[in-house]
Amino acid sequence: MAAPAPAPRILVLLLLLLPAPEGAQSELCMISHGRKVDPWVCPDFCCGNCNDQYCCSDVLKQVMWIEEDCHAPEASILTDDFDSGFDSDPVARFGTVIAIGVTLFVIAVVTVIVCCTCSCCCLYKMCRRPQPVVTTTMATTVTHTPYLQPPSYPGPTYQGYHSVVPQPGMPTAPYPTQPTGPPAYHETMAGGAALPYPASQPPYNPAYMEPPKAVP
């Protein structure tokens, strides 16, 4: 019995390897919706121009893609896609702002550190400039406060003592506050016994006259 001929298998393989007709090829069209240009896969042809394309099956209206003329829509597609994604995601926008702020802060800190350590920087010269020494003289002023004497008040008077007007020719009695003189010579004699002080002779009174003595 003869083996079957492999003609059907070879025919199927050839059909798969043959290129598809023009109308069966899918093309990437640039469909414009306002400012945004979206890529769209057309099963037939892309008709129109580089900026605004649509799907059609007419070969005469097919747009001829030229790299020099149709390069701008691709750039606009990427730009518009990036802008739309950035605007629609507030978290990404906030993260971008934080990243920019942190970067600027780090750059500022590094700049200050470099300027403070480098001798050719103006900030280093400003920080290392010697400060002028200011000498201050302190003067001490002494003020003399006048001594205030306590006010003198009259002392209490002795109620039992009355001043007596001295009589002419009579000795004045010593005041109690006057110190007494040294003791008389006859008071300090041998034996230590003090003699009584004789009474003083009364002063002479011209009005008093002795009676005349009788003559024998």
From Swiss-Prot:
Gene: SHISA5
The record's note on its domains: The proline-rich region is required for endoplasmic reticulum localization.
Similarity comment: family membership: Belongs to the shisa family.
Stretches assigned to the Extracellular side: 27-93
Source species of the chain: Bos taurus
InterPro entries associated with the record: Shisa (IPR026910), Shisa_N (IPR053891)
Record membrane topology: Single-pass type I membrane protein
Main function: Can induce apoptosis in a caspase-dependent manner and plays a role in p53/TP53-dependent apoptosis.
Signal peptide boundaries: 1-26
Annotated compartments: Endoplasmic reticulum membrane; Nucleus membrane
Pfam families (UniProt xref): Shisa_N
Chain ranges on the Cytoplasmic side, renumbered to this chain: 115-216
Biological processes, Gene Ontology terms: apoptotic process
Protein name, UniProt field: Protein shisa-5
GO CC list: endoplasmic reticulum; endoplasmic reticulum membrane; nuclear membrane
Keyword line: Apoptosis, Endoplasmic reticulum, Membrane, Nucleus, Signal, Transmembrane, Transmembrane helix
TM stretches of this protein: 94-114
Subunit structure, as described in the record: Interacts with PDCD6; PDCD6 can stabilize SHISA5.
